[in-house]
A protein has these predicted regions:
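Family-specific signature for flavin-dependent thymidylate synthase
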Residues: 1-214
């Protein structure tokens, strides 16, 4: 199985990225035209394999949506940091899968809030959130605090938290899903979607297989 470490330097939203099975999946794109079983055992990619894979991926531009199925075999895992606003939209992609993520439900009162909000969150709102967290933690340390009061205060914090709060999650997906994301989000209003799409452009064979502009 091929494994490629992907550069993420210069991108705020992505880290620790690895691409798997790029070579194997590009070779497999030619399976429908092969009749000799021994031909399927090769792990050495040739120019004709690359050309066919690129041609099949570009065929979707003409409406042949099934021809790029092999892209689903090119898997990629990465850490994604983005706002609650972007996470809500990211969850619509069926094949963009959460491995694990940070949690406001469990740890909202433990975060350093100064590092968690993007630049679009009003500083006065951040100050209010810090006050609410400080008040909760103060009550938590007191022996005589009513448990129901703590529950209510915690819910106040959860529901008051603005959309610009950023969380990091380990994600896994494939090139076919990224192709769909890129098409739909490259000019999105949210800058973090645009940054993510800019990072997609740097992936191995991205221009040939995802953007289809090469």
């Amino acid at each position: 199985m091929s494994e490629i470490q992907v550069e993420t330097k210069g991108f705020h939203c992505v880290d620790n990225a690895v691409v798997y099975d790029l070579t194997e999946s590009m070779i497999a794109a030619g399976y429908p035209m092969r009749t000799n079983t021994k031909d399927l055992l090769t792990t050495s990619i040739e120019g004709k394999d690359i050309d066919r894979a690129i041609s099949l991926s570009k065929a979707t531009l003409k409406g042949n949506q099934a021809h790029d199925q092999f892209l689903s075999g090119i898997r990629i895992a990465f850490d994604l940091r983005c706002s609650n606003k972007m996470w809500v939209e990211a969850e619509r992609y069926r094949f963009l899968t959460f491995v694990s993520s940070q949690s406001t439900m469990h740890r909202i009162t433990k975060f350093d809030l100064s590092d968690q909000y993007n630049k679009y969150v009003d500083s006065s709102i951040i100050a209010i959130m810090k006050q609410k967290v400080a008040a909760y933690n103060y009550l938590l340390e007191k022996d005589d605090t009513n448990p129901e009061t703590l529950k209510e205060k915690y819910l106040e914090i959860l529901y008051s938290n603005p959309a610009g709060f950023e969380l990091t999650a380990r994600m896994t997906t494939n090139y076919r899903c990224l192709k769909n994301i890129y098409k739909q989000r490259k000019d999105h209003r949210l800058p973090e979607w645009r940054e993510f799409c800019s990072w997609i452009e740097t992936l191995p064979f991205a221009h040939e297989l995802i953007l289809c502009d090469a």
